[in-house]
Amino acid sequence: MRLLLWWVLVLSLFLDPLRAVEEHETDAVDLFLIFNQINQLNQVIETYKKNPERSAEISLYNTQKNDLIKSLTSKVLNERDKIGIDINQNLKEQEKIKKRLSKSIKGDDFYTFMKDRLSLDILLIDETLYRFIDKIRSSIDIFSEQKDVESISDAFLLRLGQFKLYTFPKNLGNVKMHELEQMFSDYELRLNTYTEVLRYIKNHPKEVLPKNLIMEVNMDFVLNKISKVLPFTAHSLQVSKIALALMILALLLGLRKLITWLLALLLDRIFEIMQRNKKMHVNVQSSIVSPVSVFLALFSCDVALDIFYYPNASPPKVSMWVGAVYIMLLAWLVIALFKGYGEALVTNVATKSTHNFRKEVINLILKVVYFLIFIVALLGVLKQLGFNVSAIIASLGIGGLAVALAVKDVLANFFASVILLLDNSFSQGDWIVCGEVEGTVVEMGLRRTTIRAFDNALLSVPNSELAGKPIRNWSRRKVGRRIKMEIGLTYSSSQSALQLCVKDIKEMLENHPKIANGADSALQNASDYRYMFKKDIVSIDDFLGYKNNLFVFLDQFADSSINILVYCFSKTVVWEEWLEVKEDVMLKIMGIVEKHHLSFAFPSQSLYVESLPEVSLKEGAKI
């Protein structure tokens, strides 16, 4: 991101050749001055709390103070802004006071002793503040997490909590007492102010962490250079922000294919699986283009929002929702990468194992991994949105049991719908048979699935019933709808004629353009590169729905015929087209039967009479 912003800076300088390049830096902010401003506001607020007439103004000063704290928090990590505390001078002053305290006795001159003691404590809390900011700047970078900021804040809050609160004897003079009380008031106010700011940083660590590396770049300088290039005078800062955001958006989207290619190349080098297969590399690259493109678009919008709100942080709700979308996009990208490389990796492990390795285990591993990715992403989104994930999981205990008993059937249907979705048993528009139910799936809901029967009746089937019974899905066929028939020929057929008839029928089917053969297999026709790995896990033909068996044999001596079995599959699975193919096959079989002078047999019965009695006919004729 820093390189992108510097690229924009160079572009803006290139577009302004008539101007000499001037090193322009905005005045650095003194963080200690901001602390003092917050301290002064706290002093005013404490004063107004004692005056009921001014209490209405407290909210206004609180708003100003909160704005200053937010601004200060956003600048803590920016090393261009001075801390504002001369730590060397501070340490020298501490040494001087410590020497005086070591020589003085509290009982001899209480006023001088307490004055030095308070001065030393003020220097110590200033040093603590300096050490805190220095620790943040040296320890926090773009890879740091919220817990890192929280742990540093906790450590320095503990140090501030160790400073003492003092009480003064009443035998001091009014002037000295007033002076000590004033010093103590300043000391206490400063201690409370520092504590308040550190607690805010601890509770809002996101505002300290680098956001898209914008905190690392001189945004004032970049926006200033852009405003000089643009021909606008009014609202130049806002226009510069919009221009910078649009340039970053266009640049990131323009680089998406390059970034995708580099990511795929990096993964190839890591896994060393697909380096020799250029087609697979292209397919994997195309599968991750969509999530990477959406991620870059969201990232660009996120950067644009940071620029719009600069120098303040983006609203917490915006950051919350953007973070949730980031998690979902990350899950999408991980699933896409796992489908490309994960299956190949697992398959390679399986093929290198012994022959006793069960292929079902690989399928189970793949499904479990997909499910875990989904669950982790879901929990991450819930946590990002502010839900207490631990409480949600705990609530699934006793309370969940009571609810489950009350709505057992509803939950059964709901979880059945989840199982059906995960199993992918059918989709909308599929022709299925489940028990006595047959028809086309219209819609699958959380409780029931609606099916349109072939008599046009609408059936509503509970999901639990579908999940608990075998489902026959006729639509999950790519190539191959069965044609099976028995061809009965008369017993008067000769052996040679039958053999030639069987041979010709088989040759006709093998050469038929619409009958499936050995070339119609999944590996020959499937374009998805992943199936080359799945062939070692499952039968790809059965997995995708390819059937190309072809059998023609003399099958049976029936009561009235000699039967020839014809068993084959049409290439099409569409009913009407299948009927046309079947009709064509039957007509060609009839031609082959006629060619060999054979006859179709039909159910018949022969009656043999050994002798007949004489029968008298008209006019005395005899037989």
Curated annotation (Swiss-Prot):
User: Where is this protein localized, as stated in its record?
Assistant: Cell membrane
**At the top level of its lineage, which domain of life is listed?**
Bacteria
PROSITE patterns associated with the record: UPF0003
A GO BP entry is: transmembrane transport
Cell inner membrane is among the record's keywords: no
Name one cellular component (GO) term.
plasma membrane
The intrachain disulfides are: none
Q: How does it sit in the membrane?
A: Multi-pass membrane protein
Keyword Transmembrane attached: yes
Q: Where are the transmembrane segments?
A: 242-262, 288-308, 318-338, 361-381, 387-407
Sorted UniProt keywords:
Cell membrane, Membrane, Transmembrane, Transmembrane helix
| Listed InterPro entries | LSM_dom_sf, MS_channel_1st, MS_channel_C, MscS_beta-dom_sf, MscS_channel_2nd, MscS_channel_C_sf, MscS_channel_CS, MscS_channel_TM-2
A Pfam cross-reference name: MS_channel_1st
Q: Which family does it belong to?
A: Belongs to the MscS (TC 1.A.23) family.
Q: What is this protein called?
A: Uncharacterized MscS family protein jhp_0969
Look up and give the organism this protein is from: Helicobacter pylori (strain J99 / ATCC 700824) (Campylobacter pylori J99)
Taxonomic lineage of this organism? Bacteria, Pseudomonadati, Campylobacterota, Epsilonproteobacteria, Campylobacterales
